[in-house]
Regions:
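Conserved alpha-helical scaffold segments that buttress catalytic/binding sites
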Residues: 1-404
Length: 404
């Protein structure tokens, strides 16, 4: 529903639930010349980097928007896969991820950060097709610490104010910038951990988390080469896949978890050297194998689904924390909207993801967070043209049509 008749100068704000559903609105803004075709910077406030791309999708779909939208809807992680298509298409040449202080996940592309290795998206420059390379600037930072009750602290490289961001934005010429806000920036659930703990308990979830996160390739300070990290990751995925397949085909046969079985020993021998120094891998893996042997099919499937995501941030903010973060956002936006006492351009477009459908934002906090963010935007930029975009699942739409 579109909010009323607005002055021509009103700032357009698009609000969707799933984050990737802002992509059609960005493309529409480009077509309407509200956003330039290229040279766009994105300020991305989010508890997650959202820099994935589905490996099964042909990159050519980046230039076929409707097919791309369908692919993202079908992808299990489509909400994290809407930004890189904008880079690959040449629209965005700089992205700044501004994260909350509890988002400690480490972030290819030719950038050998853990996020890209995990997503199997890293490639050395000389392994890329030269005509497809799209150079872009990427920054990660935080707003000043305004949450006294949060135990983590901003690193020394954290932003002091919006002028620091402006200096970074000016490193590369920009035609305009998009302000992109995921409301889970202000309060974050990890739905994977929450669902797993509810099903199998916190102690079991902790064992699963160690199996998936205590791996040496995830330690970016141990001197491993990128090739070795990538190989370790592939070995880990293959071994866990073997275990999953064995249990799927022998659902009622516990022998796959018998320490004397060849399958068990093969998987154990493959996985043990993949763990960090100081981790008792045989003991950890034995606990995990024993655990998996006691779970029913649905619980095992939950482990495979949740395991790779148990290190995602999880911090439900109090109302006071949220108010402080919104105040920090307001200060930040005022800083970048004013340069040397002169008014600077507002964003060409604001996109907001509610993220309550998948519960990355605790659903009961939506109204509180959303109302304060919109009020913040009005305080800084004046009139807003707010549109709430709703998307219906294709199958649901067909079912409803058949009922009619």
């Amino acid at each position: 529903m579109k909010g009323g008749q607005q002055a021509p100068s009103a700032l357009r704000v698009v609000v969707a639930d799933d984050h990737h559903h802002v992509l059609p609105e960005i493309h529409a803004a480009i077509r309407r010349r509200l956003v330039p075709f290229q040279g766009v910077h994105v300020l991305h406030f989010d508890a997650h980097p959202d820099l994935s791309f589905p490996r099964s999708v042909d990159p050519a779909l980046v230039f076929e928007p409707h097919a791309l939208y369908d692919a993202l809807d079908e992808s299990v992680s489509g909400i994290a896969e809407f930004l890189l298509p904008l880079v690959y298409a040449g629209h965005v040449n700089q992205l700044m991820w501004i994260k909350p202080q509890w988002a400690t996940q480490r972030l290819c592309v030719s950038l050998p950060l853990l996020h890209f290795i995990e997503e199997d998206a890293y490639a050395a420059v000389d392994a890329m097709a030269s005509e497809t390379i799209k150079p872009w600037d990427f920054f990660i930072t935080e707003l000043p610490d305004r949450l006294p009750s949060v135990s983590t602290h901003a690193p020394s490289s954290a932003i002091v104010d919006g002028h620091d961001v402006l200096a970074q934005l000016q490193r590369k010429p920009a035609q305009a910038y998009i302000l992109d806000i995921d409301l889970d920036y202000f309060s974050t659930w990890n739905p994977f951990r929450k669902d797993l703990e509810q099903r199998v308990g916190a102690a079991t979830a902790n064992i699963v988390a160690q199996v998936f996160t205590a791996l040496r390739y995830r330690d970016m300070g141990n001197g491993m080469s990128i090739a070795a990290r990538s190989q370790d990751r592939r070995s880990f995925v293959a071994a866990l896949g073997q275990l999953e397949d064995q249990k799927a085909t022998q659902a009622n046969d516990p022998s796959v978890f018998d320490p004397s079985s060849l399958v068990y020993q093969s998987i154990l021998n493959t996985l043990t050297p993949l763990y960090r120094d100081g981790v008792d891998a045989p003991d950890l893996l034995t606990k995990f194998m024993n655990l998996m042997g006691t779970l029913d099919h649905d619980a095992r499937q939950l482990v495979w689904w949740a395991g790779p995501n148990l290190d995602l941030p999880h911090h439900m903010s109090s109302n006071d924390e949220i108010e402080r973060m919104v105040a920090a956002l307001r200060d930040f936006l005022v800083d970048i909207a004013t340069t040397n006492g002169k008014s600077a351009h507002p964003p060409s477009l604001v996109t907001i993801a509610k993220s309550t459908g998948d519960e990355y934002l605790p659903p009961h906090q939506l109204e509180f967070v959303q109302s304060r963010v919109l009020r913040c935007l009005r305080d800084v930029f004046g009139d807003l043209d707010v549109e709430f975009v709703a998307y219906e699942d294709v199958q649901d739409a067909e079912d409803n049509a058949n009922e009619e």
